[in-house]
Amino acid sequence: MGEWTILERLLEAAVQQHSTMIGRILLTVVVIFRILIVAIVGETVYDDEQTMFVCNTLQPGCNQACYDRAFPISHIRYWVFQIIMVCTPSLCFITYSVHQSAKQRERRYSTVFLALDRDPPESMGGPGGTGGGGSGGGKREDKKLQNAIVNGVLQNTENTSKETEPDCLEVKELTPHPSGLRTASRSKLRRQEGISRFYIIQVVFRNALEIGFLVGQYFLYGFSVPGLYECDRYPCIKEVECYVSRPTEKTVFLVFMFAVSGICVVLNLAELNHLGWRKIKLAVRGAQAKRKSVYEIRNKDLPRVSVPNFGRTQSSDSAYV
């Protein structure tokens, strides 16, 4: 159960910031109607699945062969595999969004550090300084006039008094350069577009996986679990009858998981509709146009440079004939 709790927390982290309302409803369906039911109810229902699968024969290996024929993969294992695969696109989106947020944070910190980076004050006791203090007097004056930058504002320390404060020292606020603001806003917009595009891609992949597992479940098990299964697989000598434990309960469970998968498919389609098919098409076309423009720029014919001809003379040409 601890592994499922970790998966639930990761999915909640993916939904809190970037998902739509439909995505949050989908998370509730996945967490409550899939993870909790499979982890709590499924283990008790399918705990004795193979041991209680009994055939009316004493032929060694016949029970195992017929069980493998009836259930190529156990219901509970199939649903666990389905949950893991369906949640994989969301986990990939978490990794991508966290990586982009970390890059944006590092870029912001580097910009702030560059803005706050200043040279140390020059010594006050140079050759043109007042009376014989030399470098020692300059250092003492520097200590008195030490300044601190707090929240982008140049301020005096407590050791500095009004008598020692020079007239040229002013309190100034660091204002960002307009070009830096444009660059930061452009990079933030590009990051948001990348996250939105990746979110749409993971919704599409998640829906494709849901449909694939739904079709696979139908072809493997159908809509019911029979109580009596007839088998003539080797090493059974003749056709034998095998009995499945709790067939009605497993049928209800199977239909319930069909319904949950269908609801997830509908919610994924509704989320894509909410995001806007037109926006999705424009995003895809924009990415294709960008790649095409880069390709055209790379393959653009460069201006031909005339190169002097250092070919062979008439006599040398005739020598090679």
UniProtKB/Swiss-Prot annotation:
Residues 117-141 are annotated as: Disordered. It holds the Pfam family Connexin. Gene3D superfamilies: Gap junction channel protein cysteine-rich domain. Keywords: Cell junction, Cell membrane, Gap junction, Membrane, Transmembrane, Transmembrane helix. GO terms for biological process: cell-cell signaling; chemical synaptic transmission; visual perception. GO terms for molecular function: gap junction channel activity. GO terms for cellular component: connexin complex; synapse. It is a multi-pass membrane protein. It comes from the Eukaryota. PROSITE patterns: CONNEXINS_1 (PS00407), CONNEXINS_2 (PS00408). The chain crosses the membrane at residues 20-42, 76-98, 198-220, 253-275. Residues 1-19, 99-197, 276-321 are cytoplasmic. InterPro entries: Connexin (IPR000500), Connexin36 (IPR002260), Connexin_CCC (IPR019570), Connexin_CS (IPR017990), Connexin_N (IPR013092), Connexin_N_sf (IPR038359). It is found in: Cell membrane; Cell junction, Gap junction. Residues 43-75, 221-252 are extracellular. Residues 125-137 have a biased composition (Gly residues). One gap junction consists of a cluster of closely packed pairs of transmembrane channels, the connexons, through which materials of low MW diffuse from one cell to a neighboring cell. Belongs to the connexin family. Delta-type subfamily. A connexon is composed of a hexamer of connexins. This is Gap junction delta-2 protein. It comes from Bos taurus.
